[in-house]
Amino acid sequence: MVKCRDILQMNLDGMWLLAGEGGLDRVVSWSYVVMTRPFADHMNAGDFALCSVDFEHFGWKEVSDAMYELDELKISGFAISIKDEREEVPVDIIDLAEKLTLPLFQIRWEKASFVDIAQSIGNYVIEAVSYTHLTLPTKLEV
């Protein structure tokens, strides 16, 4: 079983934890790039959400709203990439992650790929599930 703590320990290039350390034991079932609403139509409990903050379609108000909505869906973690890294993450977003105990990660805008990060998380989940199935005891015939 993969947890957000494991994702943090993967030391993915260009991704770090900002807040929500209390939720690092949330179980990660898959990764998903947040793009369209309603999120409930596309996401499942345990999904690790990735989101681009471009300030044209998605700004800090949308991040806050998404955090509440995604937390209700029982996602595992939330990673944001801020266009051109022109702004620091506002304190109210950090505080909200702490309040929800929702692990909030930041992904570097330059030279960090959502596709690579999503694939790395997905591959890690698949490997963990495969390993679990390989090490489960098998029924012995008597």
Give a label for each model feature.
Residues 1-136, 141:
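Alpha-helical/coil-rich non-catalytic "connector" segments in signaling and regulatory proteins
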